[in-house]
């Protein structure tokens, strides 16, 4: 689960990390009140959306007066922001974060993320802060350093020393940097975070570290023990179909293609998407029905997929292990009879009672229902139907 920058900064403050004074506004009246409460003449105004790349897309403004700040607030609120990380149609800006400007002498990129390959936590830093870390990795990889932290041991002083040397920061600041890192590490561990990214972390003229921007993402599976984090969820930032899927306990991610997918098992779902891509099609979604591979579960999945008008065909790919294919077939027939589909359905079944299941589907006489016992051929048929070639 992602949260907004202003929410991440509230968490940082609770854990003793310096952030500039600021507040969030949803309208111009609130923006004016916030500006009257802030000091100085330089202000940063930032669109609050769950996507990176805001600056280059015009979602971050630096104002040199309160009057200019109000003008920027008027432009930002209600705009649709399109970045490389948003859907094609962009995201509507409903909130902006306004904070005091800071004078600083150094910008640093810093993040904590989990490395599945090493099964350790990666502490990533770059001397080139305030810019895209992906671009830095491509153009100046020597400016990035990654330190692996064993979660059984934790973040240690020698890690901080290693960073001090790499960043060429005055060693007198060791204690301040170590305290900052320890506080970020506590958030990462105690709150079951997937990612904490500070870009940039700045060193001010009076040698204090400040988080100028903050991004946090948390493990959805651990939210049951973090009600304070769950309460920060902003459903306006995710697709309505994804919100509906969560309510129905379906693992669903909306994509850009025209082949709707209903699959049991995340691995098989990803393999299905790969095959569709290889055959020249594009998946409209990732959908793992998992334990919901029942008649009711399939019907829910169909309704969810058909909310997307770009879907031209539904490809059902089920491997019956514990789940019996004949029960799945009965569920598919029930779903097709109870839900007006309007698009063809291709069903590939394999595993327990697959032959009986395919016979049931063939004998159902349902219009637009196609069957296959071969994954490749089933996917090929789905792609052809999506393109109108059959």
Swiss-Prot record:
The keyword Magnesium applies. ATP binds at residues 46, 53-55, 99, 102, 107. Residues 9-244 form the ATP-grasp domain. SUPFAM superfamilies: Glutathione synthetase ATP-binding domain-like (SSF56059), Succinyl-CoA synthetase domains (SSF52210). It catalyses: succinate + ATP + CoA = succinyl-CoA + ADP + phosphate; GTP + succinate + CoA = succinyl-CoA + GDP + phosphate. InterPro entries: ATP-grasp_succ-CoA_synth-type, ATP_grasp_subdomain_1, Succ-CoA_synthase_bsu_CS, SUCC_ACL_C, Succ_CoA_ligase-like_bsu, Succinyl-CoA_synth-like. Its cofactor is Mg(2+). GO terms for molecular function: ATP binding; magnesium ion binding; succinate-CoA ligase (ADP-forming) activity; succinate-CoA ligase (GDP-forming) activity. GO terms for cellular component: cytosol; succinate-CoA ligase complex. Binds 1 Mg(2+) ion per subunit. Mg(2+) binds at residues 199, 213. The keyword Metal-binding applies. Pathway: Carbohydrate metabolism; tricarboxylic acid cycle; succinate from succinyl-CoA (ligase route): step 1/1. GO terms for biological process: succinyl-CoA metabolic process; tricarboxylic acid cycle. Gene3D superfamilies: ATP-grasp fold, A domain, ATP-grasp fold, B domain, Succinyl-CoA synthetase domains. Its EC number is 6.2.1.5. Keywords: ATP-binding, Ligase, Magnesium, Metal-binding, Nucleotide-binding, Tricarboxylic acid cycle. Substrate binds at residues 264, 321-323. Succinyl-CoA synthetase functions in the citric acid cycle (TCA), coupling the hydrolysis of succinyl-CoA to the synthesis of either ATP or GTP and thus represents the only step of substrate-level phosphorylation in the TCA. The beta subunit provides nucleotide specificity of the enzyme and binds the substrate succinate, while the binding sites for coenzyme A and phosphate are found in the alpha subunit. Belongs to the succinate/malate CoA ligase beta subunit family. Heterotetramer of two alpha and two beta subunits. This is Succinate--CoA ligase [ADP-forming] subunit beta. It comes from Campylobacter curvus (strain 525.92). The gene is sucC.
């Amino acid at each position: 689960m992602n949260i907004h920058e202003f929410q991440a900064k509230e968490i940082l403050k609770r854990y003793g990390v310096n952030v500039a004074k600021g507040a969030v506004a949803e309208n111009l009246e609130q923006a004016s009140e916030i500006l009257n409460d802030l000091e100085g003449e330089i202000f940063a105004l930032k669109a609050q959306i769950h996507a990176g790349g805001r600056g280059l897309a015009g979602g971050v403004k630096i104002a040199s007066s309160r009057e200019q700040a109000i003008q920027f607030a008027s432009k930002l609120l209600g705009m649709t922001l399109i970045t490389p990380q948003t859907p094609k149609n962009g995201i509507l800006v409903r909130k902006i974060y306004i904070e005091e400007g800071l004078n600083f002498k150094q910008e640093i990129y810093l993040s904590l993320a989990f490395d599945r390959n090493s099964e350790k936590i990666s502490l990533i830093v770059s001397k080139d802060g305030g810019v895209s870390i992906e671009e830095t990795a491509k153009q100046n990889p020597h400016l990035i350093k990654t330190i692996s932290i064993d979660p059984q041991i934790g973040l240690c002083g020698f890690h901080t020393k290693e960073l001090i040397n790499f960043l060429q920061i005055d060693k007198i600041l060791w204690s301040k940097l170590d305290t900052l890192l320890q506080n970020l590490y506590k958030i990462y561990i105690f709150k079951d975070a997937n990612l904490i990214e500070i870009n940039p972390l700045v060193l001010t003229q009076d040698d204090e570290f400040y988080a100028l921007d903050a991004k946090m993402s948390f493990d959805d599976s651990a939210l049951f023990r973090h009600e304070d984090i769950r309460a920060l969820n902003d459903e306006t930032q995710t697709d309505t179909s994804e919100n509906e899927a969560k309510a129905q306990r379906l693992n669903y991610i909306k994509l850009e293609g025209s082949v709707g997918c209903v699959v049991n098992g995340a691995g098989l779902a990803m393999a299905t998407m790969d095959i569709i891509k290889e055959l020249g099609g594009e998946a409209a979604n990732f959908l793992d029905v998992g334990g919901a591979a029942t008649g009711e579960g399939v019907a829910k999945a169909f309704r969810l997929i058909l909310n997307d008008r770009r879907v031209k065909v539904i490809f059902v790919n089920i491997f019956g292990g514990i789940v019996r294919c004949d029960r799945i077939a009965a569920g598919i027939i029930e779903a097709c009879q109870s839900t007006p589909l309007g698009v063809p359905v291709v069903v590939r079944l394999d595993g327990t009672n697959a032959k009986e299941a395919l016979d049931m589907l063939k004998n159902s006489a349902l219009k637009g229902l196609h069957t296959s016992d071969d994954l490749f051929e089933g996917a090929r048929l789905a792609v052809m139907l999506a393109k109108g070639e059959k």
